[in-house]
């Protein structure tokens, strides 16, 4: 990714309390400072319609298939209304969570659910996958300690250490499954600035 002036799709992934949103924001601010056309967005959400769907998904207890379809419907709206137009205009799109989060959070709850998630995505938008995904690798024990310091929470935040470990293992599995796309940043013992510098190094050496 030597030329960041062209439209590229960058996603940040991982469990709760790992600093994804912080790193997404830091990269966004850095690219803006370099006069690079860039937008920052998130999932589930990113558009007015998708944000309404997010409220249901993160606070209500849905049936597993209903939760997956809710996430996919929100993503379709987000892709068509925001992500694709920005990429077509030559912007860098930074997204806090994308398809891999759906695979781990919703796919794990269904039989063969991870493959189902990626197959659904290919059906909806066969040509749109991230150019690079940063998996912020923070050990579950550390992550849950960070979440417990927050003032706000959703249904995923409060599910306990077994859930955190399951999600962590899923992202590790995906990083092995898609090694060309998913870059693991081991961040448990690093400051946010140190993580940010590693991310920049990966971007400019691709």
Curated annotation (Swiss-Prot):
Binding annotation for ATP: 14-21
Superkingdom, taxonomy of origin: Bacteria
Catalysed transformations (reactions): dTMP + ATP = dTDP + ADP
GO molecular function, one term: dTMP kinase activity
CDD domains: TMPK
PROSITE patterns: THYMIDYLATE_KINASE
EC code(s) of this entry: 2.7.4.9
InterPro entries membership: P-loop_NTPase, Thymidylate_kin-like_dom, Thymidylate_kin_CS, Thymidylate_kinase
GO CC annotations on file: cytosol
GO terms, biological process: dTDP biosynthetic process; dTTP biosynthetic process; dUDP biosynthetic process
Key words, A-Z: ATP-binding, Kinase, Nucleotide biosynthesis, Nucleotide-binding, Transferase
Any Pfam family matching the protein: Thymidylate_kin
Family in the record: Belongs to the thymidylate kinase family.
Database matches in PANTHER family: THYMIDYLATE KINASE, UMP-CMP KINASE 2, MITOCHONDRIAL
Primary role: Phosphorylation of dTMP to form dTDP in both de novo and salvage pathways of dTTP synthesis.
Protein known as: Thymidylate kinase
Source organism of this protein record: Rickettsia felis (strain ATCC VR-1525 / URRWXCal2)
